[in-house]
C-alpha cells in the first residue's frame, strides 16, 4: 500500500473503526458528515484515491461497498465453494489472495476458482486445481467458461444455439448439461484463461 496523505489516513481510519464497531463500512454520506465534507461526492473522491493506493476496494452498486485491503490481500482472489444464489465474488467466498501476475494470462485473469470434480480432466483441468478466470460475459461457442445455472456454478465448454445452451464436459464419464434459456436462469461468470496446478507452494 502506498503512503497516505493525512486526510486519506483519516478517511481510512474512520472506515476501519466503523467496520470494527458496527460490522459494516460507512456510507459516503456518513463519511462526509463525520469528517466535515461538504457532500458525499467529496468522500467519494477520497475513496477513489484510497483505492488507487491499494488501501481499499470499492464495490460498485452498493452504498456501503467498501472493503479494506490488508497487505496480504493484494493479488488475485481465490474463490472456493460458492453458496447458492450468492455473487461469485462475495466476500464470504474468498479463501485468500495469491501473488499471481494477472498478465500471465490472456486476457488478464481477474480471479482464481478452485476446481471441484474431474469433468474437465481431458483438457488438464483437475480436481483441486486453480482455474484462472477473466470476468466477462463476452464469450464464444467452444470456449471454456464459468457458468451459473440457477444456483449452481460449473466449469464447462460452451455451445449455444438459439434458446438452448449445452455445457460440455471434457470427460466421457460425464454427460452435457442442457439449459433451456426460456425456463432456467443462466449467467456467464467468466472465461477460463489458464490453470494453476494445485501444489505445495500454495
Swiss-Prot record:
Signal peptide: none annotated. Coiled coil: none annotated. The active site is at 119 (for autocatalytic cleavage activity), 156 (for autocatalytic cleavage activity). One of its GO terms (molecular function) is serine-type endopeptidase activity. Its EC number is 3.4.21.88. GO terms for biological process: DNA repair; DNA replication; negative regulation of DNA-templated transcription; proteolysis; SOS response. The record marks 84-85 as: Cleavage. Residues 28-48 bind DNA. InterPro entries: LexA (IPR006200), LexA-like (IPR039418), LexA/Signal_pep-like_sf (IPR036286), LexA_DNA-bd_dom (IPR006199), LexA_repressor (IPR050077), Peptidase_S24_LexA (IPR006197), Peptidase_S24_S26A/B/C (IPR015927), WH-like_DNA-bd_sf (IPR036388). Represses a number of genes involved in the response to DNA damage (SOS response), including recA and lexA. Binds to the 16 bp palindromic sequence 5'-CTGTATATATATACAG-3'. In the presence of single-stranded DNA, RecA interacts with LexA causing an autocatalytic cleavage which disrupts the DNA-binding part of LexA, leading to derepression of the SOS regulon and eventually DNA repair. Homodimer. Belongs to the peptidase S24 family. This is LexA repressor. It comes from Klebsiella pneumoniae (strain 342). The lineage of its organism: Bacteria, Pseudomonadati, Pseudomonadota, Gammaproteobacteria, Enterobacterales.
Amino acid at each position: 500500500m502506498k503512503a497516505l496523505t493525512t486526510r486519506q489516513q483519516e478517511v481510512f481510519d474512520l472506515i476501519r473503526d466503523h467496520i470494527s464497531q458496527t460490522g459494516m463500512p460507512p456510507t459516503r454520506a456518513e463519511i462526509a458528515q463525520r469528517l466535515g465534507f461538504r457532500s458525499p461526492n467529496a468522500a467519494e473522491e477520497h475513496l477513489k484515491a484510497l483505492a488507487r493506493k491499494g488501501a481499499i476496494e470499492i464495490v460498485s452498486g452498493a452504498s456501503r461497498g467498501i472493503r479494506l485491503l490488508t497487505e496480504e490481500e493484494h493479488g488475485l482472489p481465490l474463490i472456493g465453494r460458492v453458496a447458492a444464489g450468492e455473487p461469485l465474488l462475495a466476500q464470504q467466498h474468498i479463501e485468500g489472495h495469491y501473488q499471481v501476475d494477472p498478465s500471465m494470462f490472456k486476457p488478464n485473469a481477474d480471479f482464481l476458482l478452485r476446481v471441484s470434480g474431474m469433468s474437465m480432466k481431458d483438457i488438464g483441468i483437475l480436481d483441486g486445481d486453480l482455474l484462472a478466470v477473466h470476468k466477462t460475459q463476452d464469450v464464444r461457442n467452444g470456449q471454456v467458461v464459468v457458468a451459473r445455472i440457477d444456483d449452481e456454478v460449473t466449469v464447462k465448454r460452451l455451445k449455444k444455439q438459439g434458446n438452448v445452451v449445452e455445457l460440455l464436459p471434457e470427460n466421457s464419464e460425464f454427460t452435457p448439461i442442457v439449459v433451456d434459456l426460456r425456463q432456467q436462469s443462466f449467467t456467464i461468470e467468466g472465461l477460463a484463461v489458464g490453470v494453476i496446478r494445485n501444489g505445495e507452494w500454495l
